[in-house]
UniProtKB/Swiss-Prot annotation:
It catalyses: Autocatalytic release of the core protein from the N-terminus of the togavirus structural polyprotein by hydrolysis of a -Trp-|-Ser- bond. Residues 38-49 have a biased composition (Polar residues). Keywords: Capsid protein, Cleavage on pair of basic residues, Disulfide bond, Fusion of virus membrane with host endosomal membrane, Fusion of virus membrane with host membrane, Glycoprotein, Host cell membrane, Host cytoplasm, Host endoplasmic reticulum, Host Golgi apparatus, Host membrane, Host nucleus, Host-virus interaction, Hydrolase, Ion channel, Ion transport, Lipoprotein, Membrane, Palmitate, Protease, RNA-binding, Serine protease, T=4 icosahedral capsid protein, Transmembrane, Transmembrane helix, Transport, Viral attachment to host cell, Viral attachment to host entry receptor, Viral ion channel, Viral penetration into host cytoplasm, Virion, Virus entry into host cell. This is Structural polyprotein. InterPro entries: Alpha_E1_glycop, Alpha_E2_glycop, Alpha_E3_glycop, Alphavir_E2_A, Alphavir_E2_B, Alphavir_E2_C, Flavivir/Alphavir_Ig-like_sf, Glycoprot_cen/dimer_sf. Glycans are attached at N278, N524, N646, N945, N1051. A motif (Nuclear export signal) lies at residues 146-156. Residues 114-264 form the Peptidase S3 domain. Disulfide bonds join C283-C289, C480-C594, C529-C554, C531-C548, C724-C745, C855-C920, C868-C900, C869-C902, C874-C884, C1065-C1077, C1107-C1182, C1112-C1186, C1134-C1176. The keyword Isomerase does not apply.
Amino acid sequence: MNRGFFNMLGRRPFPAPTAMWRPRRRRQAAPMPARNGLASQIQQLTTAVSALVIGQATRPQNPRPRPPPRQKKQAPKQPPKPKKPKPQEKKKKQPAKTKPGKRQRMALKLEADRLFDVKNEDGDVIGHALAMEGKVMKPLHVKGTIDHPVLSKLKFTKSSAYDMEFAQLPVNMRSEAFTYTSEHPEGFYNWHHGAVQYSGGRFTIPRGVGGRGDSGRPIMDNSGRVVAIVLGGADEGTRTALSVVTWNSKGKTIKTTPEGTEEWSAAPLVTAMCLLGNVSFPCNRPPTCYTREPSRALDILEENVNHEAYDTLLNAILRCGSSGRSKRSVTDDFTLTSPYLGTCSYCHHTEPCFSPIKIEQVWDEADDNTIRIQTSAQFGYDKSGAASTNKYRYMSFEQDHTVKEGTMDDIKISTSGPCRRLSYKGYFLLAKCPPGDSVTVSIASSNSATSCTMARKIKPKFVGREKYDLPPVHGKKIPCTVYDRLKETTAGYITMHRPGPHAYTSYLEESSGKVYAKPPSGKNITYECKCGDYKTGTVTTRTEITGCTAIKQCVAYKSDQTKWVFNSPDLIRHADHTAQGKLHLPFKLIPSTCMVPVAHAPNVIHGFKHISLQLDTDHLTLLTTRRLGANPEPTTEWIIGKTVRNFTVDRDGLEYIWGNHEPVRVYAQESAPGDPHGWPHEIVQHYYHRHPVYTILAVASAAVAMMIGVTVAALCACKARRECLTPYALAPNAVIPTSLALLCCVRSANAETFTETMSYFWSNSQPFFWVQLCIPLAAVIVLMRCCSCCLPFLVVAGAYLAKVDAYEHATTVPNVPQIPYKALVERAGYAPLNLEITVMSSEVLPSTNQEYITCKFTTVVPSPKVKCCGSLECQPAAHADYTCKVFGGVYPFMWGGAQCFCDSENSQMSEAYVELSADCATDHAQAIKVHTAAMKVGLRIVYGNTTSFLDVYVNGVTPGTSKDLKVIAGPISASFTPFDHKVVIHRGLVYNYDFPEYGAMKPGVFGDIQATSLTSKDLIASTDIRLLKPSAKNVHVPYTQAASGFEMWKNNSGRPLQETAPFGCKIAVNPLRAVDCSYGNIPISIDIPNAAFIRTSDAPLVSTVKCDVSECTYSADFGGMATLQYVSDREGQCPVHSHSSTATLQESTVHVLEKGAVTVHFSTASPQANFIVSLCGKKTTCNAECKPPADHIVSTPHKNDQEFQAAISKTSWSWLFALFGGASSLLIIGLTIFACSMMLTSTRR
């Protein structure tokens, strides 16, 4: 289905559009008749200019801001008039902001007649379709109809792999279609919203430019050619990476999809409904707003705090009227809140105090030493709550306790030294600080100076494998996490609530035995007294409280129910508003890149089966190594200064990583001093370095054999001499030598004939007679049966032969990536076909089950509930690790005066629970169980002149296809996976770790807080929270808690599998897999198409071939060169192949003439390479005496393994046989002489 899509983009079958501009021809071709004459051309030109010149179209919009004032006249109750000119000034600036740039104007001009809207059933534009190269193309995920009378009726061909569909463009529209290009060098390109940057193989745009509804828009170069088609985007902090469709030089479509991509098809709007009491209303159109009714607006937010459309409701609450701009300010949400006073542990670095800039919390999860601070003051607002970039506001700790303001220059942040303020919003500051044991935020103004210090260790952080104090100017960029400085980002929510009543003695005055309630100017206060009877009231001016004679009999407080305050443990929760709201936590932790140093590259000295790394660094740098065989033996060491490290390297290879350099893999060659084809001492020297044990055994055995042979030969010669010196006695009693006497004992023998044998069987054993007689008869019967079945077999075989369209070839390929396996397919009646199979990549894909995710927790301590002269009771709550406790006898007196009348009956309900940290979305770990693993390999198969790439599962069942080729692989010879049953994934690194089961949490251990996903509501935790009794000096919630198990695990997690996996596996995630593991062998069955074979009559026939090896160096590379001299009957292509595993040829096919010679290169690991080579099926033997390589260490793995018969050179065998032959000859000669002497001297009477 996709093949037509490729061909459509690759062949360019349609002519390019002409240079002449013909505006909006597509809209006039079908519905209207063609106009003739000069008037028609002038009208078309006028229409095109008015539609395309955007700058002229925007200028007449200046007088249009007149309608809004008409609506404002309907509400004459609002007295302040200065508010009217402010929106007019803003609207005057709108045309300047929306004026398109040069790139945008060019894109709009080119899109006018070539880009079509795609609409849904409601008529909303949800995407776009593009006319290009004779086709109309539309993203597949854009479900709608093209807004064109002709194009909407076309039949589209779908390509799900590339998320595109296309149809033939009508002939009368083809000349105006876009053309595409596969050339897109790095730089900037044009699209509907301005400039698009192409760098590092990705298209990116500034954040906030483009979004839903832009799917299908083209990205064009300066010539107007389409470079890519936009499908979606992925938010990456300050920029957005685009998901696009591009084309390579061959016209093949390439889809690029960044991680986290969202499709940019405008989804239909679904209006969410919110509640207020029993009345429902659209969340984007609440019945009131905060400016009109602050208290009711907060009621609406609190009642819908858990609604999915809470953000939409919050946005609508913050603006009044539907006629205004739909886009709100990014800093106006904290106008709902108020600063407050809180208890600071260390004010002015000395003692506790009630501070207007109390530090609530400090986050230091970023990798660039940036911290996020939450305080009780608010930044970016003036005292009225309006957004002001250079101001902050705080709650005054003077008697009036009013909100005051100051300039941001008065705010100072420090740790062990001053910090650099990066950004601020609401309660939050973002700063980059040096390491220290505490964080201090201070207000240093001319009127007053105050500070708050929080004990918090800010440790020096670094990313990568090299420690540094300051980031370098030049180096290498690697992934890291930083706090986003943009104020629009959100890391989650912070809980808010209405403030409770706090009593202040400054609101009471005692004079002449009377008590007066004295409210601040323009404020209301409420007093409660126990002067015999209970008395209460709310006053706005100085008022006497009758019947009371002492201040301690009364409390007075003010309570503002039109503002939220942070859910701080230093504030009392209001009794009438226990519900909570929430606001966004700014400065989200996002993935980014950080500049890190790169240490000096090590000076590597290669030796025989070892390397020496001469290291020199002025900062701590990590050196890790692992072997690439079955036993990785990983090592880890932090190094500083000058040093030398030595490592042994074998044939399997060694990988070392020095600092932030890329991993380096080295392999040992079988290099050694001496000469395997030289004199004996050179042979012994060579093999002693390669195989010391066997060489020592061989030399010792030869020496022992020589000594034994010489000794036995000498002894036998002495014995023979002594026995043979005595002559025979010619006496009457002479004896015959034993050797002659033995000859007389030899008896003659002859075989019986067949007739005699059968006669014997007939007379003595008739059953054996019949058995012997039936043997020839059985042979005749079997032969006749075979001849009778031969003809039907050939008929059946001939019937099926015509249906076979492929030839099956089975082989076994080593699972070593990038090492080709070569074979020669010999089929009767056809010329030999060369076959090359290369495992390009392999993946071990385990089936996984995520048990839970865990991360650092945040302890939420809500504002306590305080009840005077009574008791409270805890209620169950649906929070993780929720703890509640009621304490009595609290707060008889507080800062500023009496809070409760009673001395011991007062009670406080303290609560605490945990939540996932605000930065959990970026910094969390996945606990995963691993089950049965599958294996998938990417194969490159070359047969004849055809090359195919395909992916196939190695299970022996699932076939893989590529064009006419069918492959079945597996099962692999040995099952293997580097993963244990339980693994943990953290920031792309994989660890084998036996984590606790889901629901079995333990405080201070990995998994102390668990959730099935980052957005799920099933959070469970066990952190050992223990609430303590508060002291009477101020409102607070003391508690103790276990440390974060996630943080403890991060500090003791060990090395990841990426650095310790055996067989050189590369570990990857999303999905979890092990890549390019070199182990085992893969059986492969290939169905080769018949068209790939050439009949013998059509292929060159080589009659003679001779091999001469001109040069040979055994190594990992192709160090051998051989010349094949041949005689052929015609010119053509011939496959050349090595039939021995001793050597691998580099060439697969050579061009032959009628007579000549070709040179081939081969690789071997043996000093004596004797291998059979075939040229067009004609075989010959190449004998090569190879020399050892000069390089001891190489960067490529070996292509051949050593074989025993080729591991020892022919010269070595000759010398060895000579040594053993000399010793055995001496031994045999000695024994022969001894035997002869014994036979001649021993006599027999």
